Design a protein with these regions (language model features):
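Catalytic core of pol beta-like nucleotidyltransferases
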Residues: 1-24, 33-35, 39, 49-106
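Glycine-rich beta-strand-to-loop/alpha-helix junction loops that act as flexible
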Residues: 29-31
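Short beta-strand->loop micro-motif that forms the acidic, two-metal-ion catalytic signature
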Residues: 43-47
Length: 106
């Protein structure tokens, strides 16, 4: 479960990203989603977008970095398209299982 500050940061990230692309899903996972994060924990974010170019991937990383810097937080982004997931490009990645099991959709 996200605390209110994490929820606010996630909403801010989604809002900023929505200005540059359509967001199919934005899911927080990892220690912040489980509720056992400490001051040093990063925020793990899965972002699903319709299409992904190198430019868009870079822009998403830059926005996450800016918001993280404003909030003294490292934001790790995992960005994929529906095709990446459907075609198994992410494979049997344990991160996908964690996202499904503990993820908090924003």
């Amino acid at each position: 479960m996200l605390d209110s500050k994490d929820s606010q940061i996630a909403q801010q990230l989604k809002s900023r990203l929505s200005q540059i692309t359509q967001i199919e899903q934005l899911v927080i996972f990892g220690s912040r989603a489980r509720g056992n994060a400490d001051r040093e924990s990063d925020m793990d974010v899965f972002i699903e977008v319709p299409t992904l170019t190198p430019h868009l991937r870079r822009s998403i990383s830059e926005i996450a970095w800016e918001i993280g810097l404003e909030n003294d937080l490292l934001i790790f982004t995992l960005v994929a398209t529906p095709g990446d997931i459907r075609n198994g490009l992410l494979g049997a990645n344990p991160i996908l299982r964690a996202i499904e099991k503990e993820g908090v959709a924003i």
